[in-house]
Amino acid sequence: MSSVSAAGATPPASPGCIAGIGMDLLRIERIERALARHGDRFAQKILGPKELAKFQARRRRDPARGVRFLATRFAAKEAFSKAIGLGMRMPMSWRRVQTLNAPGGRPVLVIGAELADWFDARFGAAHVSITDESDMAAAYVIVERKPAPDGRP
């Protein structure tokens, strides 16, 4: 698991309390069908700019790998929306949170400016874990409670 603040910097380790947990599990075939039905518009609706560039590069090299990438990012966004308690309603939207990779490869959540103020006012760090295997993709997100001004969780 990894954590990133809304600004994209990895926060220091803290004894934060859990504010929310989200999980999503989906069949990769569901994403394949959506791409077949809606084409690139589907990926453009779901992915942020950096995710979209990575998706397109992976799909060019290996179409199946591109679909798995899109499925894990879809699952991460669903899991994040559940962890923060909003679902897919404002200020949360598909493109306002991206799952990118830290230099070592671990997945990190990067929250866009449109959502960052809302998130930072309520929460501390967000942690994400994603996986795909065979015909399934899954993501778990844990959101920490915002620490008290005196530093206590």
From Swiss-Prot:
Transmembrane segments: none
One GO cellular component term: cytoplasm
Catalytic activity from the UniProt record: apo-[ACP] + CoA = holo-[ACP] + adenosine 3',5'-bisphosphate + H(+)
InterPro entries: 4-PPantetheinyl_Trfase_dom, 4-PPantetheinyl_Trfase_dom_sf, ACPS, Ppantetheine-prot_Trfase_dom
GO biological process: fatty acid biosynthetic process
GO molecular function, one term: magnesium ion binding
Keywords: Cytoplasm, Fatty acid biosynthesis, Fatty acid metabolism, Lipid biosynthesis, Lipid metabolism, Magnesium, Metal-binding, Transferase
Record-linked SUPFAM superfamilies: 4'-phosphopantetheinyl transferase (SSF56214)
Major place of residence: cytoplasm
EC number(s) stated in the UniProt entry for this protein: 2.7.8.7
Cofactor entry: Mg(2+)
Binding-site list for Mg(2+): D24, E78
Cellular localization per UniProt: Cytoplasm
Keyword Membrane: no
Assigned protein family: Belongs to the P-Pant transferase superfamily. AcpS family.
Biological function: Transfers the 4'-phosphopantetheine moiety from coenzyme A to a Ser of acyl-carrier-protein.
Protein name: Holo-[acyl-carrier-protein] synthase
Annotated source species: Bordetella pertussis (strain Tohama I / ATCC BAA-589 / NCTC 13251)
UniProt gene name: acpS
